[in-house]
Amino acid sequence: MTDYPFYKPDDETNIIYNININKKEGFSAIKSCSLAKLIEKLTSTKQLHTYFSSAFFLTYRDFTTPLEIINLLISRYTGPPPDSSKDSLRLFEIEVDIVQANVLSIFRTLIGTLIQVDFDTPKLSSSIIEFFNSLPESVKNELFLEFFKAKKMARPPGSIPKPVNSNIISSAASTMRFSYSVSPKTQSPNSTNNVLSGLLSNNGSNTMNGINGTSNNNVNSNNNNNNGTTNISSPNFDPSRSSMKMGKGIMKLLQSNIANFNNQQNGGGGGGSNNGTSPQSSPSSTLSSTNSLFNQQPSLSMLNDDGSVQNNNNNNNNNNNNNNVNEISTINVQLPPSTPPINGIPGEKTAFLPEAIAKELTIMEWELITALSVSDITSKEWNKSVNIQNLTTWFNRISSWVSTKIISKETPEERAIIIEAFINIANFAKELKNYNCVMEILGSLHGSSISRLKSSWALLSQKTNDMFQILNNLMTTDGNFKNYRKILTTVLPNEPCIPYLGLFLTDYTYLDESNPSLSTDSNLINIDRIFLISTRVQEFFQLFTNCNYTFISNMSVRDAILGEKVWDENEIFRLSKIREETSSLQSLKESNGIGNSNSTSGGSSSSLVNKDGSGGGGGSGGGGSVNSKGDGKGDGKDNRDGRGDGNSNCGNGSGISSKDKDLLLSSSSSAASHTVRRKNFVTKYRMSFTGNDPLPSVSSTLSEREWKILTTNSKTIIYPRGKTVLSVGETNTNIYRVISGRVKVETLKSFNSSDADLGAGGGGGGDNRGEDNSLMAIKARNRLSLNLPAQDDGYYVEEGEIFGQESFLYTDRPMLSNIIVDSGECELMEIEKSFVLQLFASEHQLSATFYKFIGVIQAQLLKSIYINFTSNYGNGGSGGSGSNGNGGGSSNGAGGGGLSSSVSIGNLNSPNINRIDFKRRSTIFETPSSLDILRDGNDSSFRTKFGLSQDEVIIKRYQCKHNNMNGTLYITKHNLCFEGKFLGINKNKTIPFDRTDKILTVDKNIMTVTTKEKVKKFTFKSHDDLNEGYGISVQIWANHLNINVKQQLQLQQQQLQQQQQQPSQQPSQQQSQSSQLQQSVSASSTTPPVPNSPKVGRGESFSNIKDLPSKDEWNQILKGTKPLTFKKGEILICEGVEYQKMFQIVKGECSVVKSLLPTPLDQNIFNNINNNNNNNNNNNNNNNNNNNNNNNNNNNGNNNNSIFKNNSSISNTNSNTSIDGGVGGGLSPQTLVDPKNSVIVSKLTHGSIFGEMSFLLPGGSATSLVVSSDEVEVYIIESYFLHILLKSKPYLASKFYKYLACVLETRVRNLT
């Protein structure tokens, strides 16, 4: 007798019922049963139990296989065999119609759960097809149609996009955009493809922005994303909805499981990897946010695809005849949106209300969550599920974006505004029932990076704090999210809701792991588990199924959000420590009543008031942020002139180092008044979206006010045309600014015939050791090979620009160029170096701005050399000599040999080519900041108060006492001014320098100013203030009277000697005072004696230069670095791509490579470079401006041309990788450098830095960087980290920017 699995009597071997439950209750009465008994019960009812059927197929793969179920269903459909028992045959005969109908219904559900692996199993497919063929014709056709449709729609378990090769340097900070794919099976009508831009298709048909999707269909679907309902391929659920009750202690168990999962996922490291192997664990990033939301920031799982590069289809025919050389199609590199315009004028900032932002975030997350299918959840391979990974990545990106937006703001007030804005966004998201968004924002606000910003949180209004507390109570983890689960039960069936995905995955993980699929004692199927999991899945999917939001997407808001920058989690943490350190020191300053007497720097320029309007402290001339009691509180008034109302000295700065004081004074006050904050109420809740908004950083230009300070001791000189201002070999000790007219800087570098012959037609071996391989030398050799006269390279310094800035970088270095007047009459301002250096000793912010300004000038000059070199390529009609000296020229104007340092470049500087008039940015002033405007207002009020001329500005101010009256002493260009208050009456005194006979110092921190009328005494708070103020005052006074500063020192020493003869004096103290004064005065005429900086963090040797970063200071900078290793031939930087990073070579060697053909960046900046192309078309499309004669430039090249002398070809090992933000669609970094049309400019070795030009200037990189040694290790530091670090530490910024200026000046000098 054949064993038939059905119609067996119920016993403990095949079914177990729950106690005290009527068996007539159906499956709810069953505790566990065998698979055959389950199918028997499921198919024997008159009406199929659709809810249990759907619930069963959610979890059936945990205890059986599709093939086993198919065999049982076929056996159930055909009935018992003839030799079965009579009872079995009789029972089947009675219910045959019901059974067969139910079996076919179950078959339809089963087919919908099959995946590609199942269809690829021959035995399973053949069993289904054979069974279908045995059915009646009408039923057979219907089932076959469903079967093949499901097979076509089936896909293998989705895999997340491969992460970008960690060795490829990102071209910009990550943005909200990231790449992902969506299967047509799970793609919702809302077009999930359109949620996140940056989607790169294989054929590169995407738009550059990625905002509009990949096709017109996507655009249309996005515009109509609210007009339909969302359907998901899920089983039919019971319409009843009940909240899942979770027992106590569940979260502790989950934390243990999740911790184990995170260790598997991340190897104990940070969150960034999603390559875990545990199929029953939830994504680390989402779950870690669930369990430690209020203890730490969610870990990041970033995919750095914030931009794209597409191939231009119009250029598909370029290089099509070259079969042996790497082909390069014309690549249209779109500069990132963060690139400021060339003229330095930023665009308008867009701003949106929190409600608009919350709505757009809701729409985008709705499109993502409605793409989820039940199979994404039940497969438990969440690390391979594309839709879950999209939501997980989105969750972490939003959380990181919130942190980035807050940390990027410089002042506590600004950070408080952003925090309030995000709390309002979260509140609107709660009203929209987007609880996933609420958790994204709360997860960031409760992270350690944001929660430590106490000074910012203290500025929140009570209304915002109450709102924040309500949100916390709603999403608190207390009672296993009791409040959140309760609010979900109130959501109506037709009301759209976006639940918190992390909690659902946590619940699913718990239910799956705490309820075994088979009972341990009887090995029967656990029916309770099926009900528990199906109920939870039903609750989750029912929240966003068959309903939709009624509002439509706002593309402006979407584009703004997707263009926002997202920083690395670890760097956010480090930057928040810097922010909190700055705010803590500021609070300490206020609590101690420290005014602004020791330094006047603050904000983005050199001087004189803090950002909150405070000035020189808490005396009668104090600065508004410190009152008469020295308690650090303001008077509540908007004192635009920086004056306070106190009558007594405030506390001193004991216990705070000079660096900390500088940090204090450079930071903004966190004690802004409530009245002032309420003035910004209208705009404070409109968040500015600039994804490219430049970070608060040291200004790269000097304002007119700063120029007035720097030119305090300057003199004006008028030169006629042709007059040589400075000549080669002369030692310059000043800096000059052109007031009117212009001068020419002539950089003459001659090459004798022997030097030129090294690269021209002699020597067949081509061993060119000992030759000058600089860019200018190559150009000169090629000019000699064409019998062209030598060309002197130079540039013009126009009105408002400066020259001679090298004197501030080096001491006693002879001039390497001639400075000649090139206009009818030229008026120059000669700025005294000694006074400026004396001022820099205390004005670190002004010093940093000045040296950054010089660095920018050097970077622009270097960039102009590169672009001019490119613009003159290929214009000669004669070919140059080959790299081996064989002179086999070609008509394209380029040598045909492999690229080496001595490659012939052809007629680079043909006389018929106009040189580019590169206008340097030293005359372009940035838009004045609010702080600049405030300072200008203070100067205006100050001039009015003392009746001074309009050219007067406050250089320094000090708290002091005069005639028993506390006040403030101001040092200006022409006067000493004292402002005090006695018995409520203001006392103002002005002492012109030109009416002063002498300035001396005496005991007890007293400086005496002698005039014809009488001697005035000013008592400073400290010796440091006295020495600093005295040194600056003597410099200005001596300049007014043309007195030698050393004579003043001798007078002071004579006075001290006379005083020493009196018994009442203390000789030791006077000698100490004399020594201090001598140091102060000598510092006014020489560079401040700072110890030489060790050679740490740099390769160039600047051992004779002072005021460079020390070893400890370099360690501060290198804290934000990331080490990466590259192999020989790999390209670290691609020309034309913007890199918001700086790099340092730790080990190995790299070659700086310049393309001989204009890059798209060159064409965008200088659209006149290619005006002489053979196709003189008048269109302005720079990306297609290459002439047709250049299409075959690569046809004559040799095989495997290399940019290295050893002829090793460029490695293509990373051909499948992409550069973040710059390259996509299968393009590798190697395809961006054409070895035939490139030349090595220089070599960089251990310790060298690069990327400094991109750090100082906007736009893409001017050169490429290629690894030339076997291996190179580099440190990478993000520019935003460096900007914030330097902005918060002006004393370090001054040294760092001076170092950058020295590096760039050296490179310019080597190329000219």
Swiss-Prot record:
This is Cyclic GMP-binding protein D. Residues 630-644 have a biased composition (Basic and acidic residues). A nucleoside 3',5'-cyclic phosphate 1 binds at residues 698-857. Residues 940-1006 form the GRAM domain. It comes from the Eukaryota. Keywords: cGMP, cGMP-binding, Guanine-nucleotide releasing factor, Nucleotide-binding, Repeat. Coiled coil: none annotated. Residues 26-155 form the N-terminal Ras-GEF domain. Residues 353-582 form the Ras-GEF domain. One of its GO terms (biological process) is cGMP-mediated signaling.
